[in-house]
């Protein structure tokens, strides 16, 4: 049996070792003919490349989910021109708005079929900024709204997957998620720190919003069977040509650009990690974190007796933060 992330021995994040990992391309015989997929944040960068490569593998219907429909339509027009037999649609979802996320998930219920969803929308901000829901914007987009959308999609993915196959849900994560440290005393809350301006440090705060999913997915996998929906996290690595760092300090951006030019993966390589996680690999990835095209350990804080406490704490705090839609009841509806 393939070990899952929780079965592996954690270690420090070794950036250059990861960037130089052997590329494992999508097998040439991979086909998604007849399938329907949802890709959020697919108007540019890795999301667009992933959408393109899925269509090249025969995808029949693609839902591009974006905050700005006009940008989505520009991307869709290029894809329609190249893949004329496929249906490419643009749907709006604003990850800064709970109402928008709920409306998008409700629209997904109208689809006849959904084979897999790839939640790729994310952002990095250089300065502390509160969004319309009252949370720091990276925390809102990268964690709270992403988890909300993931949970809302679970029942739909279970129902709409082809007969005999589980639904597939891949959440794009980051290697930086291996870096943050977390409190080790029972009284410390985890999520509120993400909204504390006095503790905001751009890159560390971004990494923290990504690391939270490591705790959450362990608990989710205890409740949702891989026979119903396979849920995993994937890190694409640092990729050339993406604009994720566009909001970073202008003094930092050139450094990131230089590192990308030296060690960055190509767009095709980065997008292949998404396709491996959502299409190629199977139920063995359920509840795991994929990095360098393989199942990888979580953030070190997930492990051990204190890790178990932290997993419970993040889970319960997340249930409370999203209690307005009773996500516990939704998860129970697809539980084993």
Enumerate the predicted regions with their spans:
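C-terminal helix/juxtamembrane-tail motif
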Residues: 316-336
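C-terminal helical subdomain
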Residues: 101, 257-298, 308-310, 320
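A recurrent short beta-strand within the Rossmann-like NAD(P)-dependent oxidoreductase core
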Residues: 169, 231-232, 274, 287-290, ...
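Alpha-helical packing segments of well-folded alpha/beta enzyme cores
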Residues: 75, 213-216, 270-274, 314, ...
């Amino acid at each position: 049996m393939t070990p899952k992330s929780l079965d592996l021995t954690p270690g420090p994040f070794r950036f250059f070792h990861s960037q130089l990992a052997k590329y494992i391309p999508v097998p040439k015989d991979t086909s998604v003919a007849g399938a329907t997929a949802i890709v959020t944040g697919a108007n540019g960068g890795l999301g667009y490349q992933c959408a393109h490569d899925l269509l090249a593998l025969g995808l029949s219907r693609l839902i591009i989910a974006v905050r700005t429909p006009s940008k989505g339509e520009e991307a869709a027009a290029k894809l329609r021109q190249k893949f004329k037999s496929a249906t490419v649609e643009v749907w709006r979802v604003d990850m800064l708005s709970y109402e928008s996320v709920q409306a998008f998930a409700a629209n997904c219920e109208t689809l006849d079929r959904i084979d897999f969803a790839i939640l790729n929308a994310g952002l990095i901000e250089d300065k502390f900024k509160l969004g319309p829901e009252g949370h720091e914007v990276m925390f809102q987009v990268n964690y709270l709204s992403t988890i909300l959308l993931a949970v809302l999609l679970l029942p739909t993915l279970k129902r709409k997957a082809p007969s005999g196959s589980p639904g597939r849900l891949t959440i794009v994560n980051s290697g930086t998620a291996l870096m943050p440290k977390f409190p080790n005393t029972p009284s410390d809350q985890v999520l509120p720190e993400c909204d504390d301006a006095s503790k905001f440090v751009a890159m560390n705060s971004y990494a923290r919003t990504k690391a939270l999913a490591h705790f959450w997915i362990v608990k989710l996998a205890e409740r949702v069977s891989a026979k119903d929906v396979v849920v995993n996290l994937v890190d694409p690595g640092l990729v050339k040509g993406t604009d994720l760092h566009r909001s970073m300090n202008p003094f930092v951006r050139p450094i990131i650009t230089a590192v990308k030019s030296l060690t960055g993966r190509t767009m095709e390589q980065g997008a292949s990690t998404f396709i491996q996680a959502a299409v190629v690999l199977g139920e063995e990835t359920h509840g795991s974190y994929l990095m360098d095209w393989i199942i990888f350990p979580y953030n070190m804080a997930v492990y051990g007796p204190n890790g178990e406490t932290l997993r419970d704490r993040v889970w319960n705090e997340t249930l409370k933060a999203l209690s307005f839609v009773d996500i516990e009841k939704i998860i129970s509806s697809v539980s084993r």
